[in-house]
Amino acid sequence: MERRIFVDAAPLELSPREFAVLELLMLRQGRVVSKVQLQEHLASFGHAIGEASHDVVGDTAIEVYVHRVRRKIEHSEAEIVTVRGFGYLLQARAPV
């Protein structure tokens, strides 16, 4: 199954793990997603695409994936906000 995300009608180029991070944030848009929830989602997503089930994604790797996704959606109407001590939140970008 092919999964795609579009920004302004253009497909967003994401690695499988970047896709998984953005997917979970989109599914829970407006709610804080913890690093543990992201780790669990990445593990189940990895299993679905054939990665070894023992692969654990650490906090630093999650921070890197979130940073990469932030850069890739920086021109969209959404932004990923860090909620210090809790996790991440996908929300509509505030008007400038």
Identify the meaning behind each predicted range.
Residues M1-A20, V32, V83, L89-V96:
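A structural micro-motif at secondary-structure boundaries
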Residues I49-A52, A94-V96:
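Short, low-complexity, intrinsically disordered N-terminal peptides in bacterial proteins
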Residues A10-G46, H67-V69:
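Short amphipathic alpha-helical recognition elements used for nucleic-acid or partner binding
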Residues I5, F45-I49:
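Alpha-helix C-capping/helix-to-loop hinge sites
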Residues E13-E23, E51-E74, R84-Y88:
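DNA-recognition element of transcription regulators
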Residues V33-S34, G50-E51, V81:
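Short linear functional motifs in flexible/disordered or boundary regions
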